[in-house]
Structure formats: C-alpha cells, structure tokens
Amino acid sequence: MSIRRLPETLVNRIAAGEVVERPAAALKELVENAIDAGATRIAVRIAEGGIARLEVEDDGCGMTAADMVLALERHATSKLPDDAIEAVTTLGFRGEALPSIASVARLTLESRTAGGDGWRRVVDNGAVVAEGPAALGQGTRVIVEHLFARVPARRKFLRSARSEYAACLDVVRRLAMARPDVGFTLEHDGRRVLDVQGGQDRVGRVAALTSRDLAANSIGVDLDRGEVHLGGVISLPTYNRGIADHQYLFVNGRPVKDRLLVGALRGAYADLLARDRHPVVALFLDVPTGEVDVNVHPAKTEVRFRDPQLIRGMIVGGLRRALDEHGFRSVQKPAEAALAAWQQEPVAPPPATGFLFDRRAGAAVHPFAAEVSLPAADVARVYDRLMPFTAPAPLAGRAEVAATPPPAAEAHPLGIARGQIAKTYIVAEAEDGLVIVDQHAAHERLVLETLKRGMAGQAVPSQGLLIPEVVELDEPACDRLEAAADGLAALGVELERFGPGAVMVRATPAMLGAIDCHRLVTDIADDLAGYDAALGLNERLELVAATMACHGSVRAGRTLSVAEMNALLRQMEVTPHSGQCNHGRPTWVKLAMGDVERLFGRK
C-alpha cells in the first residue's frame, strides 16, 4: 500500500487516544483550560462517572465566536508564543484538547468575553452540527456528552461509573490543591461532593481536600536552594496509608506523577515506613521554567529536570531534616480512636462466695443461711479475720520521709514507668496524662538509630563468631550481598563470598546478641533485592538496618524491671524518630488526663 495522508477525523481520533483515554483525562484538560483563562471560580458537574456527561463552567476571560472556531482546530492555542516552548507557564499549550475531545464525543462550547456577546458551537464526533447565540455571563461553559459512544473499541475499556467518578474526583482535587486562589465545586449525579472557596492558603486548601486529622499529624516543609523552592506538608511516619493515593506532587503548579519525585519521597521515608505503607504528602516544587521540561507526554503528567540529582537530593534531604526535627512526635489519631471506642459497661458484682455481714443488723446473710447458722458474735469475729481491710488499721508511731521518694512524672516527657501490661506495653505516668509504650517497637527504633550512626562513621561494635557460619543462597542474592559488603561491615555484619552460591558470615553486631545468623542474612538479601533502583545503596542499607534492628530488639512477652522500663523511656526521649517504629507504627500513645477524667464522668 502506498503512503497517504490520514483523514483529519482519523488524525483527531488518534490524538484523542493519547490525550483522552477516559473521562477523567477529558475533565483534566477542560479544568486546566479554565484555570489558564484566569477563572476565579470553576464549577464541575458530571453524570455516571463522566461517561454520560461532563460539564465545566468558569468565569474566566471567555472567547469570541472567531476564537471558538480556532479553539476546535488542532494545534491552535493562545497560550504559546513562537519562542516559548522552553518556558511554558500555562497548564495547557498544545492546542489538542478540545478538537481531540470533540472527535470522540458530542461537545457543546459556549463562551462570552467581557462586553461581548455569548456564542454557542456544537460539534458531534468531529462534525459541526449547530452554532448560534448563547445566554451566559462572562466565561466559558463546555459540555461533553456520550464520550466514546461511536468508538466502541475505546468505550469497552472504560471501568464502572464508580471507578470513573473516583478518577474524576482525584483530578479535581489535585487541580484544586494546586490553585488555592481559585474556588472549585464538583457535583456528581446532582449531589455536591466538593466545595472549596478561593483565596485560601496552601495549608488550608490541603487540609480542606484531605483528612481533618492531617493538620494534627503533619509537618510543614519550606526549603529554598538557589532558585528552587520546595514547600508543602508531609505526614508523620505514623500517619500512613496502605496505598499511595494521598500523595500529591506539583511542579510549578502542575499536578504530576513523576518517578523521580516518587522515588525521592520513598527515599526520605526509607527506614521510617514498611514497604507496603505510604505517607500522606502534598509537595509543591517551584523550579525555573528553563530547568524543567513539561513537554514530555501529551497528558503533561510527566516532567524532566535538567539536574535531576539536585532535585532528588533536595527532596530527600529537606524531608529528612523536617522528619528529624519532629522525630519524637507520635501520631495522635490512635489515642483519639481508642478513646472513642472506649465504652462504659456495667460491672456486674462477683457472685457471693462467702459470708455477707451487715453490722448494723448484727446478722449474717448467706445463700445457705437456712442450713447453717452461727451466733452473731462468732460471725463478726470470723468476718474481721477474713477481711481485715474493711476497717483502717489504727495509726501508730509517727510519719517518716521515705529515703528514696518515687520519681516525679513532671521531670520527663514520657513520664515514669508505673507498670507493664501483657509483658508488652509499658504504662507510664506523665505530667499531663497516661503514656502507653510498645516496648518492642520502641526498642526496635533505638537499635536502628544506633545502626544508622554506625553507617555515618561511628562504627557499630561487632562480635566475631567462634565458628564462621556458611549461609547458602542463590547466586544473584550472593552477588548483592558481596556488592554491599563494605556497607554491611559498617553495620557490624562481616561476610565474604564462599563459592558461587554461599556467603560466609564472620561477625554480627554485638548489640543484637545471640541471633539466628542464617535468617538474618537471608532477610538482608531479600531487602537488597526488594527495593528498586529508585533508592540509592545507602538508602537500601538503611532499610537493611531496619531489618537487623527488628532481629535484635526486646520482644513482646518479656518481663521488664521498673529500672529497665525507665531506661527505655529515657533513651526514647533523646533518640531521633523514637515516636515511630521502623514500620511506621507509633511506639507510644498518650491519653490526656482530661480524657481519663471524662471516662469516669469527672468532666
């Protein structure tokens, strides 16, 4: 077949396949157009997840009738001067969105400029079917109906209305977060699901669009490096989710899903969260336009940086410092949830197993009183011998000051240990409430921070094995261990290659005590294999250190003395990140004294 030009309608449908893959993609393009038009208020209405209908209305600058004709042609835009492709400042610039959408749906475009007349133009799957005057205020209204109705090959790949709605909601939420100066509303099937006012600051907009708990469990980020600025909020490691759906990343006000940024985020939380847990973040990166390329993909969700290592280092280092400064904090949500779930239950009196004596009546009461009887005087004498605590003992002598008074809880943030529950949890009394500590999680963090100091140059003491242990593994695992041998030596693990499918372990960290050497090395090999290239070797070694810390920590089920419990509390108070274990779970929670008093009806 000879080479020929493709028909314009087919070209538009091919372009639509890149730009408009689902209703959420079409919605993103329309809302971005509204933002670029200078809108201060954007209203979005969708039906059946956007499959049946999408409507975006704004109060931006609007278009004339002549501009509306050009807007529906490919590669026609007002946003890109001839020489500005390297310095794009608008969200859209390709001039492909409207014609691409109009080629696979019925699109109604209505617009009016300040002081001009409203105009309406209707395009059905690439063909203009109607146009004429329209009644509306300044701004633009775009209605998209029956998306992919005439492209069954694309429509059958759409998901359920609920899934498509969730994707549309995510698009609006991200764009609303990027522009706190603009008001947004979203209605789905006639029900308003989102409404935020313009003029908010970034932190206020993020809180309004995410969880109310985030404000109390987050850290502010504000960092400058030359002309690059990084701002936003990040959650405490203990405030995390099972999926990464609450990670909002923006570059120059543009929502992106970039592998470099996601990898940097994982690196910052590397030894603070388990692999299957994810922080809640909203990060805004402002970079000179010449240092970033947004013209990578038609959907404009990917970017390329001129100096990616600078950006990655800034994110990892900046977030690490912010987390270090708040390492003692623990999430407050568990304590509040526990308090809400704590319900008062009536306490039934224990069944009577002995004598009940009413001194006022001078008689004994017992279930078998009809069969057994004693003189009242004898009953009273037996009762007093069995229950000596019913009356206070007479005072004798004089009061003496204790030689070693109990320590005051006010002297320490985590209080003074008062006991242990289930050989797992330390109960401490603080100045302003009750503190409960997970002994294994807390000690795990303390061991990890010691190992990390070893990686930073303060060598971790090791203990040589009397008989070196050979651990058999597959060859790729041995290769990874051999490559990381120097880093592992700083952590106190000394090993060397022992043939193609084994390594010989000569020493382990002294602080871990007697451990299962085979299991430790196997877990280290799995950790080195389990993290992709988005993390550097040092970051992966920190994750290895987290695994080692778990092997050598105080286990749940071990009875601790009061001195051991207090020593653990004091060490926690001076250790970075002691508020969470290596898997992102809290190491301690606090029940404020006011909450305790409310439980007993005192407040």
From Swiss-Prot:
Going by the entry's taxonomy, the superkingdom of the source organism is recorded as: Bacteria
Q: Identify the InterPro entries for this entry.
A: DNA_mismatch_repair_CS, DNA_mismatch_repair_MutL, DNA_mismatch_S5_2-like, HATPase_C_sf, MutL/Mlh/PMS, MutL/Mlh/Pms-like, MutL_C, MutL_C_dimsub
Name a GO CC annotation attached to this entry: mismatch repair complex
Its keywords, alphabetically, are: DNA damage, DNA repair
What are the recorded GO MF terms, alphabetically?
ATP binding; ATP hydrolysis activity; ATP-dependent DNA damage sensor activity; mismatched DNA binding
Is Nucleus set as a keyword in this record? Answer: no
CDD domains (UniProt xref) = HATPase_MutL-MLH-PMS-like (cd16926), MutL_Trans (cd00782)
One GO BP annotation of this record: mismatch repair
PANTHER family for the chain: DNA MISMATCH REPAIR PROTEIN MLH, PMS, MUTL, DNA MISMATCH REPAIR PROTEIN MLH1
Q: Which family does it belong to?
A: Belongs to the DNA mismatch repair MutL/HexB family.
Function as written in the Swiss-Prot or TrEMBL entry: This protein is involved in the repair of mismatches in DNA. It is required for dam-dependent methyl-directed DNA mismatch repair. May act as a 'molecular matchmaker', a protein that promotes the formation of a stable complex between two or more DNA-binding proteins in an ATP-dependent manner without itself being part of a final effector complex.
This chain belongs to the protein called DNA mismatch repair protein MutL
Q: What is the source species?
A: Sphingopyxis alaskensis (strain DSM 13593 / LMG 18877 / RB2256) (Sphingomonas alaskensis)
Which taxonomic lineage does the organism of this UniProt entry have? Answer: Bacteria, Pseudomonadati, Pseudomonadota, Alphaproteobacteria, Sphingomonadales
Q: Which gene encodes it?
A: mutL
